[in-house]
Amino acid sequence: MPISLPRQLALGCLLLLLGAIFIGGEQPGAGNLFSTPWDKLVHLLVFGSIGVLVALGFPTLSLSAVLLAVAAAGAVDEMHQMFLAGRQAGIDDWLADLAGGLFALPVISRLRLLYVACAVNKKAR
């Protein structure tokens, strides 16, 4: 069974975002793009977006599995930074990543309800 276009778009955006984090994070000066506390807001927004994209790309995943995926992506990102010159891993950054995943959960729930409502409405026609 082919993957629907919305899922393909979500998965494509997810891969692009993860690639931007890991490849972009290796660039000189990447660790100085955002000063404290704005860097935590960026972590929250980026990893919240990852959560939404994971949920859209894998619609059968539970919310806890989506949160676990966000936590894992954040942990891998922080571990990756341990090996980069001028970068450092931080539990505070990972907690901001996790907070982004948590804040995304109500958005994901709402998107799923809208999807079900649209599917029921389409079926009723």
Explain the meaning of each model-derived region.
Residues R110-K123:
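Membrane-interface capping segments at transmembrane-helix boundaries
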